[in-house]
Every structure is written in C-alpha cells, then in structure tokens.
Amino acid sequence: MTRQATPRTRLTREQSRDQTRECLLDAARSLFMTKGFVGASVEDIAQEAGYTRGAFYSNFDSKAELLVELLRRDHEAMEVDLRAIFEANASREVMEARVMTFYSRLPQDNKMFLLWVEAKLLAARDARFRTRFNAFMKEKRERLAAYIEEFSARVGTPLPIAPDLMALGLMGLCDGVQFLATADPQHVTPPVVEAVLGRFFARVVYGRDA
C-alpha cells in the first residue's frame, strides 16, 4: 500500500515574512563574521540567504539596521544567562561567585565582539547610524545598571558608585580588555583576561580581592 505524503503546511504571509527575516539575519551574521560589516554587501547577504535584494529591503531599511538587530539579539542572549543567575535561589556567597565568573568570562563567550567594534566605528563616522546605535547602547547600559542595583540589594552589598556609572565602567573595562586580547592573543590570553576582569570586579564591586 502506497503511503500518502503528508501535505506541507502553507505558511501565512506573516510566517513567511518572519522566515525570510530570520534567514537574512543568519546569512548576515555569517558574512559579517567572515568578511566584516563593510566587506559584506546587501547583495551578498540576500544571495547567501537565497533571496533577492528586494526581499532584503522589504525587511530592513539598510544594512546598518540589520546590524543593530543582530547586536540586540546578541545582548538579549547574554541577558538570558545573567537572568538565570538571578533567578537561582542561591546564597550570597554563591551568587557573588557566579556573577564574578560570568563577568570575567564575558570576552571568551562573546563571539560577536568584532561586530560590536565595527558598529562603534560606524557610529563614530556616520551621524545617522550614531543616533540609532547610541539609543540602543543607552538602553543596554540602563538594563545593566538595573541588574547591578538588583544584585546589590539581593546580596546586601552597597555600591561604591552609582549603578549607571558602574555599568559604564564595567562595560568599558570588558570591551577594552577584549580588544587587547583580540589584537594580541599570544600575550593577553584567556586566563589573563579572566584574572584581570575578575580581580577588578571583586575590588570595585565587593571591595576585596578575588
């Protein structure tokens, strides 16, 4: 007896659009990581995803808009890991250790660092992109500051500086150390990066050595 093929479910217009958008984002992420933001054209992205240039512009106003969406998703993925630490019913000591480990390992876990660097360079040169990117970065700092404030309340450790300033400082330190590690991996090795970030974090946030 011949088995009848299961009819393929037809996607709605919204589902088809979402699928196209996801394919374009996946293709762009892959190309940006290999060719860089500047080196990958809209045509390259559309071709890699299996769509037309028109399909690209039906989903994104520009390559820069797509870049911000990729960075937003990267940040949201990081937040999921951070949120998991806060939702665990752990003691103060365990929570402090987990947060410090999370921060000190951020550079090793951030596979899209060079895209963040390219976005910052683009923001420095392109006023229109700068407005959009800086609004996103402001939101990112505010969310991190909220986590810092919540962490301080949860473990009962008073903050030495305002949460927004600490968020800015911790982000700047992490980015700077990762930049050095990317440029000179022979000397700024993962253990060195982890030690630097961990010790600075412990001293600034906890007021003690790691």
Q: What does each model-found stretch correspond to?
A:
Residues M1-Q19, D209-A210:
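N-terminal intrinsically disordered/low-complexity leader segments
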Residues S16-A28, I45, L70-D74, M78, ...:
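Generic hydrophobic, amphipathic alpha-helix propensity
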Residues C23, A27-E65, E69:
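Helix-turn-helix
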Residues C23, A27-T34, D81-I85, L115, ...:
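Solvent-exposed, amphipathic alpha-helical segments
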Residues E69, V80-M112, P163-L170:
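Hydrophobic alpha-helical connector segments
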Residues E76, V80, A84, Q108-L114, ...:
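Amphipathic alpha-helical packing segments from all-alpha helical-bundle domains
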Residues V94-M95, Q108-T131, F179-T182:
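Amphipathic alpha-helical segments used for helix-helix packing
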Residues R130-N134, F151-A210:
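Hydrophobic/aromatic-rich alpha-helical bundle segments in the mid-to-C-terminal region
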